Amino acid sequence: MNVYEIIRRPVVTEKSTIQKEENNQLTFEVDKKANKVEIARAIERIFKVKVLDVRTSTVNGKFKRRGKVLGKRRDWKKAMVTLAPGARIDFFDGV
């Protein structure tokens, strides 16, 4: 699997911003089939940083209603990546 297929997008929320500032931990939406080793290698290769730890979680999609029609958002996988001390990814600045 290509490293750019593994990492889909950063998850920018209030909680993830606090985790970044306090624990040097970033959150990404990743491919559901990717494992922790593949995620760590992809982050290291794309952003040229050292990854210490990867924690993953599968997020269930919410049920949404539009009128009579009931639909469901897709399930997705979230990866919380802890970077080495001193390492940082710049595109999160100012977000």
Swiss-Prot record:
Name of one Pfam family that matches: Ribosomal_L23
InterPro entries referenced in this protein's UniProt entry, alphabetically: Nucleotide-bd_a/b_plait_sf (IPR012677), Ribosomal_uL23-like (IPR013025), Ribosomal_uL23/eL15/eS24_sf (IPR012678)
Disulfide bonds: none
Regions annotated as coiled coil: none
Biological process, per Gene Ontology: translation
UniProt cross-references to SUPFAM superfamilies, sorted A to Z: Ribosomal proteins S24e, L23 and L15e
GO cellular component, one term: ribosome
GO molecular function: rRNA binding; structural constituent of ribosome
Record has tRNA processing as a keyword: no
UniProtKB keywords: Ribonucleoprotein, Ribosomal protein, RNA-binding, rRNA-binding
Family recorded in the similarity comment: Belongs to the universal ribosomal protein uL23 family.
Function: One of the early assembly proteins it binds 23S rRNA. One of the proteins that surrounds the polypeptide exit tunnel on the outside of the ribosome. Forms the main docking site for trigger factor binding to the ribosome.
Quaternary structure and partners: Part of the 50S ribosomal subunit. Contacts protein L29, and trigger factor when it is bound to the ribosome.
Matches recorded under PANTHER family: 60S RIBOSOMAL PROTEIN L23A
HAMAP family listed in its UniProt record: Ribosomal_uL23_B
Protein's name in the database: Large ribosomal subunit protein uL23
